[in-house]
Amino acid sequence: KVRGLIQKKQVDNNVILAENAKKIVEERFGDPALSVETVCRELHVSSSFFSKVFKQETGLTFLNYLINRRMEEAKKLLDKTDYKSHVIGEMVGYPEPNYFSYVFKKNCGVSPVKYRKLEETKNGQ
């Protein structure tokens, strides 16, 4: 019974750790310096422990979670604003325009410029 309580507490702590990391991503995904190391320092845990727990709780590595969040925001900005692609890249944590285009295309299947054109066509603009 005691062992079960200890395991439950650990599970709860793991959930809290992952949620806190997700909050940090939400608040600072636009910071190009945001990394596993940064988050681990703030949450006072080792990177190996954190990486294991984060993947267990979210199904994603921290880096993939961060990239997904950045791409989600980039797509929203491409849809809803007229900002140039390189400006959007900077806003979501990629100050180097070519690298932003590379990551966007790798994750979304098309370049940011092409994505915007496809969305405009789809929305009849």
PLM ranges: what are they?
Residues 1-4, 45:
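An amphipathic alpha-helical interaction segment
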Residues 3-10, 22-34, 54-58, 75-84, ...:
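Basic, amphipathic alpha-helical hairpins
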Residues 8-19, 60-66:
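Short, Lys/Arg-enriched anionic-surface-contact patches
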Residues 14-18, 36, 85:
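The cytosolic transmitter module of two-component sensor histidine kinases
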Residues 34-35, 116:
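Short, hydrophobic secondary-structure boundary micro-motifs
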Residues 37-66, 91-111:
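Basic/polar phosphate-binding segments, predominantly the helix-turn-helix DNA-binding elements
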Residues 56-95, 117-125:
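Terminal helix-turn-helix DNA-binding modules in bacterial transcription factors
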